[in-house]
């Protein structure tokens, strides 16, 4: 809602959001054009931001506003916090620097991954911390100290992460949780379960069941190409595994019984027009957090804690999971949260597989990578070479530099690039060239590994079985 209309009441805003939400859903259901849907979604986000600015809290479906919240939060640094919008489906901010993650930690009630925790992980594993930890890419956690306590006392835990297979080709941003999860599996030597939520994508997207399942299998090949240990990793499709495992389905039903419709409406913004499959799906994403969902691996034990590496937008699912866990007699899962991988056009939103120009795909050729980076990567450089040499570039908003923080292993080289670009010694074209030289071999090597993943290997990873780990 434009700022020039201060007469609009919070209740009117609330009703406008509900109406706009219905419009978005009807456009999606009616297979409207992408531009039309995107425009409606942007209007919905704008209305929600205006509501938060007026009320001091997020919009919640079926919770009409009472009196407006105090306006003391409208200070000089309030704007970015009010304009950050994060949920499992949408990530949006007006800041070129991206989401304010410190404020997101406060809003979500998680804990910052500080130097002390990173040092403790290093002591426990005897390994140098992964660059994602060193650089704050994994920046937030829930109960990681508890996992380390268990590990140091020789008590087991397992890893759980996942992928929503919405397309055949994955982009480089999708690799982030898997690169880090592989490192965790290697340094802690623990089993891993990977959920492919093909059922979710069928419910949310215009896909057939067969398409959703085929995407799950194709995406599994990219995940396997990250190098996971076949003896310690189980990848499963929800559409497959739900019918195979009574332990998994029993946990889904337990969770469903202990979470109300009102709770999921408050957490996820569901409305009366959403299909019942969407409303019950969070229980399916929650169930792998409990070890007896995998009796073939954990022998019906219920006391083995789970550690979930994921992007911060998935946290609402696991806040719900952690809330319900003690009520059904299970330990709460621990979490490690990552930042978002920005779109080529800037950090205002995360990279999307639906927009080919916003993404570097794992199927892209060396030429396509070069063209996309040179043509579309948002620059923090100046308008002219003379100005850039004099004033330097801005690494905080430059997408090429952001990508290097994810993929360039050498800390010293990254710091030198930062200094050279900030001082003006390095030009935007040179920075983009440095990124291209990192991305091209990384993706070519991934493609070579993926070619070696046969249908038989996928089947073995996706077959329920005992893993090579002895739980005492």
UniProtKB/Swiss-Prot annotation:
Annotated TM spans: none
Record-annotated WHEP-TRS domain positions: 9-65
Organism superkingdom: Eukaryota
Gene Ontology biological process terms in this record: angiogenesis; positive regulation of gene expression; positive regulation of protein-containing complex assembly; regulation of angiogenesis; tryptophanyl-tRNA aminoacylation
Any GO MF annotation of the entry: protein domain specific binding
Any one GO CC term of the record: nucleus
Motif interval(s): 'HIGH' region: 165-174
Keyword Nucleotide-binding: yes
Keywords: Aminoacyl-tRNA synthetase, Angiogenesis, ATP-binding, Cytoplasm, Ligase, Nucleotide-binding, Phosphoprotein, Protein biosynthesis
Keyword Ligase recorded: yes
Main subcellular location: cytoplasm
Function: Catalyzes the attachment of tryptophan to tRNA(Trp) in a two-step reaction: tryptophan is first activated by ATP to form Trp-AMP and then transferred to the acceptor end of the tRNA(Trp). Could also possess an angiostatic activity.
Assigned protein family: Belongs to the class-I aminoacyl-tRNA synthetase family.
Subunit structure: Homodimer. Interacts with oxidized form of GAPDH.
PANTHER family per UniProt: TRYPTOPHAN--TRNA LIGASE, CYTOPLASMIC (PTHR10055:SF1), TRYPTOPHANYL-TRNA SYNTHETASE (PTHR10055)
Record's protein name: Tryptophan--tRNA ligase, cytoplasmic
């Amino acid at each position: 809602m434009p700022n020039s209309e201060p007469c609009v009441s919070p209740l009117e805003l609330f009703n406008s959001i509900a109406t706009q939400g219905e419009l978005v859903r009807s456009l999606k259901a009616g297979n409207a054009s992408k531009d039309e849907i995107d425009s409606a979604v942007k209007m919905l986000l704008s209305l929600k931001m205006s509501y938060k600015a007026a009320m001091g809290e997020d919009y919640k479906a079926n919770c009409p506003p009472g009196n407006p919240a105090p306006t003391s939060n409208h200070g000089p640094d309030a704007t970015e916090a009010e304009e950050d919008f994060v949920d499992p489906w949408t990530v949006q901010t007006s800041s070129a620097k991206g989401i304010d993650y410190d404020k997101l930690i406060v809003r979500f009630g998680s804990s910052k991954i500080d130097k002390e925790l990173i040092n403790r992980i290093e002591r426990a594993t005897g390994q140098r911390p992964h660059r994602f930890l060193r650089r704050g890419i994994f920046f937030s956690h829930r109960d990681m100290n508890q996992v380390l306590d268990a590990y140091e006392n020789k008590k087991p835990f397992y890893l759980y992460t996942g992928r929503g297979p919405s397309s055949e080709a994955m982009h480089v941003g999708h690799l982030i949780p898997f690169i880090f999860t592989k490192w965790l599996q290697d340094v802690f030597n623990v089993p891993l379960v990977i959920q492919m939520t093909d059922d979710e994508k069928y419910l949310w997207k215009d896909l057939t069941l067969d398409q959703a399942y085929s995407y799950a299998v194709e995406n599994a090949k990219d995940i396997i190409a990250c190098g996971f240990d076949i003896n310690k990793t189980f990848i499963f499709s929800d559409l497959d595994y739900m019918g195979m495992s009574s332990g998994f389905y029993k946990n889904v039903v337990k969770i469903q019984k202990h979470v109300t419709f009102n709770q999921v409406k408050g957490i996820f913004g569901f409305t009366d027009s959403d299909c019942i499959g969407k409303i019950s799906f969070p229980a399916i994403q929650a169930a792998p957090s409990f070890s007896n969902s995998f009796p073939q691996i954990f022998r019906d034990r219920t006391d083995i804690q789970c550690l979930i590496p994921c992007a911060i937008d998935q946290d609402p699912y696991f806040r719900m999971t952690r809330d319900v866990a003690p009520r059904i007699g299970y330990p709460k899962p621990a979490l490690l949260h990552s930042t978002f991988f920005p779109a080529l056009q800037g950090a205002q939103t995360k990279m999307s597989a639906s927009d080919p120009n916003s993404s570097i795909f794992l199927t892209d050729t060396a030429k396509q990578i070069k063209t996309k980076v040179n043509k579309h990567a948002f620059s923090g450089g100046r308008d002219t070479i003379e100005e850039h040499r004099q004033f330097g570039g801005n690494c905080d908003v430059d997408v090429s530099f952001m990508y290097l923080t994810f993929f360039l292993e050498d800390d010293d080289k990254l710091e030198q690039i930062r200094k050279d670009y900030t001082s003006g010694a390095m030009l935007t074209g040179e920075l983009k060239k440095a990124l291209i030289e990192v991305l091209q071999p990384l993706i070519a090597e991934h493609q070579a590994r993926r070619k070696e993943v046969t249908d038989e290997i996928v089947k073995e990873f996706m077959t329920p079985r005992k893993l090579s780990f002895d739980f005492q």
